[in-house]
Swiss-Prot record:
Matching InterPro entries: COMM, COMMD3
Xref: PROSITE patterns: COMM
Tissue and organ expression note: Widely expressed with highest expression in thymus.
GO biological process: sodium ion transport
Keywords associated with the record: Cytoplasm, Ion transport, Nucleus, Sodium, Sodium transport, Transcription, Transcription regulation, Transport, Ubl conjugation pathway
Gene expressing this chain: COMMD3
Disulfide bonding pattern of the chain: none
Name recorded for this polypeptide: COMM domain-containing protein 3
Subcellular location: Cytoplasm; Nucleus
Length: 195
């Protein structure tokens, strides 16, 4: 697992008993799992009274580092020995390593389901439909009459059985800009395949 320097620093701060006592460490670890696995979780998970003495910037940095490591561990399907080795490298003590591994094992199945639902490929555009709409906006200062295009992209994702649609509204200039960029992308792709 390769983690950025920022994540490593945040994780090392989390390992420091002077920054996070045992209770604060447990609360932050559970908050990291909760924020990843619970769709209704919000920033309030970090508002526990036992975390108030910690600088909010440090708290959020360590929370993000823990969440990143949890996701990476889940992505690589890390086992207890892999987790322990990395945590030891980050100067975690035995008690914190055991707590982290236990919490990870308790949430491993939910984490794998979450990661599996994200998918591995970008959606593929299969169809485009559009219609012209005329917008009339009036107020006391001015009137604006202009055409707008309602564009709907039908997409298909190989990882997901559902085929959602992406809809947006744009002006003629924005649509021309989009078409120009798509033509440029198409030409670049053609050149790349000819090499």
């Amino acid at each position: 697992m390769e983690l950025s320097e920022s994540v490593q620093k945040g994780f090392q701060m989390l390992a420091d008993p002077r920054s996070f006592d045992s209770n604060a460490f447990t609360l932050l670890l559970r908050a990291a799992f909760q924020s990843l696995l619970d769709a209704q979780a919000d920033e309030a998970v970090l508002d526990h009274p036992d975390l108030k003495h910690i600088d909010p910037v440090v708290l959020k940095h360590c929370h993000a580092a823990a969440a990143t490591y949890i996701l990476e561990a889940g992505k690589h399907r890390a086992d207890k020995s892999t987790l322990s080795t990395y945590l030891e490298d980050c100067k975690f003590d035995r008690e914190r390593i055991e707590l982290f591994c236990t919490e990870y094992q308790n949430n491993k199945n939910s984490l794998e389901i979450l990661l599996g639902s994200i998918g591995r490929s970008l959606p593929h555009i299969t169809d485009v439909s559009w219609r012209l709409e005329y917008q009339i906006k009036t107020n006391q200062l001015h009137r604006m009459y202009r055409p707008a295009y309602l564009v709907t992209l039908s997409v298909q994702n190989t990882d997901s059985p559902s085929y959602p649609e992406i809809s947006f509204s744009c002006s003629m200039e924005q649509l021309q800009d989009l078409v120009g960029k798509l033509k440029d992308a198409s030409k670049s792709l053609e050149r790349a395949t000819q090499l």
